[in-house]
Amino acid sequence: MANFPDLLKGSSCRSHCGILTGLGVGPGDPDLITVKALTCLEQAAVVAYPRGRQGAPGLAQRIIADRLAPHQHQLPLDFPYVLEAEILEDAWQKAAEQVWQVLRQGQDVVFACEGDLGFYSTFTYLAQALAAHHPNLIIRRVPGICSPMAAVSALGIPLTLQSDKLVILPALYSLADLDQALDWAEVTVLLKVNSVYPQVWALLQRRQLLHQSSVVVRASQLDQEIYDDLSRYPELQLPYFSLMVIRCP
């Protein structure tokens, strides 16, 4: 991880420091925020969240927008949608610096992120960056509903049953990974399937699994879309927040 500036180094973070609380605010429907997360959000003086793309509000910001009061300070943080390690580490460093500026003054910060904190969450990187330099910093976590659970709810099916094995692939860089998952698990979930949909569709056609496969776009949001039985949809144009559920017989 990239080095932090002197401001962040060597701090013992004594009792005057604020508390960092991560809030999983669910997959998109504001009513799916847990009671505990909503309580923490409404009591917060400083609310941080990932900044959206190209100046547009991000998903977490949109989820909590109607819950925020005018007196609450909002702190958008930049987490770029890239794979380059140096760019990501630099972004985590800068986000940690911004949050630390608040915490070191004794103010608490809540960080809202879509889904659940433990499921491919940006909060993990922020918390790790701060904890590495401030081991006595109090960090709390409030779990939320992640997108696969919202997706299967929309489809009206269980995610798993009895002894079903489950594989979740956050991104697909090789079709061999999907082949291996389908050989092993009864249920496979593909996140961010938008960029590889044609290749995945062809693989599922070869394995005769299209009828048991579905796509949910923007699960639980007002503009949610459901595509069941993918044999009917060989050429879908999907947005970023799209996931696929595949059930092997």
Regions found by a protein language model. Give the residues of each.
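Class I S-adenosyl-L-methionine
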Residues: A2-P30, V35-A37, E42-I138, D223-D228, ...
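Solvent-exposed alpha-helices and their adjacent loops that cap or buttress functional pockets
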Residues: S12-C17, T39-C40, L103, F111, ...
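A contiguous loop/helix-start segment that scaffolds small-molecule binding in enzyme catalytic cores
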Residues: L20, L182-P249
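Small/polar loops that bind or transfer phosphate-bearing groups
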Residues: G24-V25, F111-E114, P143, P170, ...
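Short, acidic/turn-prone active-site loops that include or flank metal/cofactor-
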Residues: P27-G28, G52-G55, F79-P80, D164-Y173, ...
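General small-molecule cofactor/ligand-binding pocket signal
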Residues: L75, R140-V142, S214
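A polyampholytic, Gly/Pro-enriched intrinsically disordered region
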Residues: K94-V102, P158-P170, R232-L243
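Class I SAM-dependent methyltransferase SAM-binding "motif I" and its flanking Rossmann-like core
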Residues: G115, F119-W184, E235
